[in-house]
Amino acid sequence: MDGPRGLGVTASDFGLEGPRGWAFRGVGVDAGPGSLIAVAGPSGSGRTCLLLALTGRMRSTEGTATVGGATLPRQMAAARRASALAHVPGVTDLDPALTVGEHLLERALLQRRFGGSLKDSLRGPLRPRAERAAEGKLRIDSALAAAGLDREALPKGSRTAVRDLERLEALRLSVALALVGRPGLLGVDDTDLKLSDAERAEVWALLKSIAQSGTTVVAVCGEAPDGAVRVSTRPTHHTSETDDKETADALAETGRS
């Protein structure tokens, strides 16, 4: 299986205005493939909206941006196909009643059915079942290793319910699920929310490792770590409630995938 190929990200005077005002504006980015990009700013400053816009899930209204070979907003679908999201409230929520193994199996099945090219989708049912199962296992094992999640270390292994995971374990699982599709760009929201200093350090070490392996990472945070490409969102008059409403409206238009 081919390794991930990170996507370069550029933006100039990038902005998004909704019916309630600007979610963000005047954003500039210049990051090469395999970069760790930290979107830093206070809550309510449009950080999540910027993350969703750069991954083709919200439509920008000002300026220009490119993600790999996709120009935004004209080629949002291409940006969506090349990227994946993790730990985004309301978008990638884990089901607390399902186990870790069930989440991973579901994602592998979805990837097999919808994640490849049209040619792969048509060929998939014709491949031997053992071959398909082996590829799915390889994807899962590779994603778990990259996310630093050891199933054997969990209370009940793969049968551990999501509701029983620690906060950091749940974040690692969300990242692993996103990596099953081997995206060129990984977007992670709220990387440092409600985490201790030690846990934050673990998360940044994880995201730096993923970036070093080739996948470009865009991470929303309160404070950017050393060595990251720092992108700031400008505070607006929005409240968090308003920001959440605009995010929901945009996702209803473009889809959550």
Task: For each feature predicted by the language model, list its residue ranges.
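Conserved ABC transporter NBD signature motif
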Residues: 60-71
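Hydrophobic anchor residue at the start of the ABC signature
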Residues: 175
